[in-house]
Amino acid sequence: MFAKSFPLNPFLESVADRIRERVKGLTGVESLELAPDLKNIYGKTDGEDFFIFNELHQSRGFRKLHIETAVFEPSLEILHVVFFPDPAFDLPIFGVDLIAVPQGISAAIVDLSPVRDKLPRTIENQLAQIEIPSFEKVRKLPDWGDIFSSHVQFITPIGAEENGFFLDLVDKFLTILIDYSESIEPDLDDSPFTIERIEGQMYYCLQQKQNDKTRNVLAKAFSPNWANQYIEMVLFDMPVHTKNLDN
């Protein structure tokens, strides 16, 4: 169901594999269509090869399950994961980003980001019960980081032990989300709660699009127009009133 792409940094691969495994617990997972030139991408920047591979699915409760792996040979590897809920379901956005350089993992973030004023109470309570390791290097959130929850973990993991701690957090966050998604029913498409969650996802996407680092890397490898298209259509597409995938 979730195919691997090209060889990755082993830690990025282990996180991606854990996410793929947990997604098997969702109901009604099916592929999402994506134009071939946006799914498997090859380019060059400064004479070095650049690969992007996208895995896109949907399921009951989620309009898009996106796993992106990218390699800028030989010095940069990226894992980008965002699970956007079907707005009819009262669910947060699951997000993971990992950046690997030759020296190790330079950045790692995981969160369940609210699309209303706060997280669902059950999810909030379960996240609060997680024992967060004392990571040596905690990073500062960007200026547009108000989209993240109070439980976000943004770090530079030091060594194999902290890598393992972070992987465990990814697993716990995602397990909480998936278990909760299977326990709730959707609201109507025209419910004010659904509309509010659509607006919350739109704000999340708008804030993420302020990340100029992503745009600059893509523009350098391809072109500014292509970078904008990729960000708008693949990474942070806006939600619409979706059909509930309720089996």
Curated annotation (Swiss-Prot):
Q: Which species is this record about?
A: Prochlorococcus marinus (strain SARG / CCMP1375 / SS120)
Q: What is the protein's known function?
A: Catalyzes the four-electron reduction of biliverdin IX-alpha (2-electron reduction at both the A and D rings); the reaction proceeds via an isolatable 2-electron intermediate, 181,182-dihydrobiliverdin.
Q: Which HAMAP family match?
A: Ferredoxin_bilin_red (MF_00618)
Can the keyword Oxidoreductase be found in this entry's annotation? yes
Say if the entry is tagged with keyword Acetylation. Answer: no
GO terms, biological process: phytochromobilin biosynthetic process
Matching entries from InterPro entries are given as: Ferredoxin-dep_bilin_Rdtase (IPR009249), Ferredoxin_bilin_OxRdtase (IPR022870)
Catalyzed reactions: (2R,3Z)-phycocyanobilin + 4 oxidized [2Fe-2S]-[ferredoxin] = biliverdin IXalpha + 4 reduced [2Fe-2S]-[ferredoxin] + 4 H(+)
Where is coiled-coil annotated?
A: none
Q: Cite the GO molecular-function annotations of the record.
A: cobalt ion binding; phycocyanobilin:ferredoxin oxidoreductase activity
Enzyme Commission no: 1.3.7.5
Q: What is this protein called?
A: Phycocyanobilin:ferredoxin oxidoreductase
